């Protein structure tokens, strides 16, 4: 199954049922922060639901070549997630999503993991385009694609509905030729 070493501290890997307790715990601990922008944090699933349903679904999704929902590990400890979703192999494109627990912010984990997943998308999956979208008000999430060199394409007005509120989304993209030019 999918495991990708980013550097000596960071690993991206598919979650296993044994990760369910830690995942549920992280989401609950960060619920107020994550719930502003991510629907799943509004009413977090239980560890049992992650173990019995959600994690097995994510593993099937990967096996069926429909995307990657993976854990982010820092020094072996689960600290967040990263995904390659809306995978469209016909048009050779996908989107990246991510979140991280507050205690792990500021260590460059998300940026490094995104760079690794982008390389994987372009080199292994032979995609041509990777996109990231973030709520206009989610400055920390928006900083990631801006730091990496994504191009801001535009906004989707009221493109996100979470916590009973609509939020505008900013869309960013990076093309394979741009990524190769950065190296």
Swiss-Prot record:
E.C. designation(s): 2.3.1.-
EC top class named in words: transferase
GO molecular function: protein N-terminal-serine acetyltransferase activity; protein-N-terminal-alanine acetyltransferase activity
Cited InterPro entries: Acyl_CoA_acyltransferase (IPR016181), GNAT_dom (IPR000182), Ribosomal_N-acetyltransferase (IPR051908)
Gene3D superfamilies in the record: 3.40.630.30
One annotated Gene Ontology cellular component of this protein: cytoplasm
N-acetyltransferase domain boundaries: 10-176
Top-level taxon of origin: Bacteria
Keywords, sorted A to Z: Acyltransferase, Transferase
Role noted for this protein: Putative N-acetyltransferase. May act on ribosomal proteins (Potential).
Subunit structure: Homohexamer, and homodimer.
Family in the record: Belongs to the acetyltransferase family.
Designated name of the protein: Putative ribosomal N-acetyltransferase YdaF
Organism for this UniProt entry: Bacillus subtilis (strain 168)
Gene that encodes it: ydaF
């Amino acid at each position: 199954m999918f495991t990708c070493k980013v550097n000596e501290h960071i690993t991206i890997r598919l979650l296993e049922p044994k990760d369910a307790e830690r995942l549920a715990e992280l989401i609950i601990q960060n619920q107020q922060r994550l719930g502003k922008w991510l629907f799943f944090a509004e009413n977090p699933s239980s560890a049992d639901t992650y173990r019995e349903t959600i994690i097995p679904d994510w593993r099937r999704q990967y096996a069926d070549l429909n995307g990657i929902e993976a854990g982010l590990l820092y020094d072996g400890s689960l600290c967040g997630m990263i995904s390659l979703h809306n995978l469209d192999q016909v048009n050779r494109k996908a989107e990246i999503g991510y979140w991280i627990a507050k205690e792990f912010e500021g260590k460059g984990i998300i940026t490094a993991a995104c760079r690794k997943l982008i390389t994987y998308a372009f080199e292994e999956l032979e995609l041509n385009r990777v996109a990231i979208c973030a709520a206009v008000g989610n400055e920390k999430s928006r900083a990631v694609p801006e730091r990496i060199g994504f191009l801001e394409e535009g906004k989707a007005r009221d493109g996100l509905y979470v916590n009973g509120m609509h939020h505008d989304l900013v869309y960013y993209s990076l093309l394979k030729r741009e990524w190769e030019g950065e190296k």
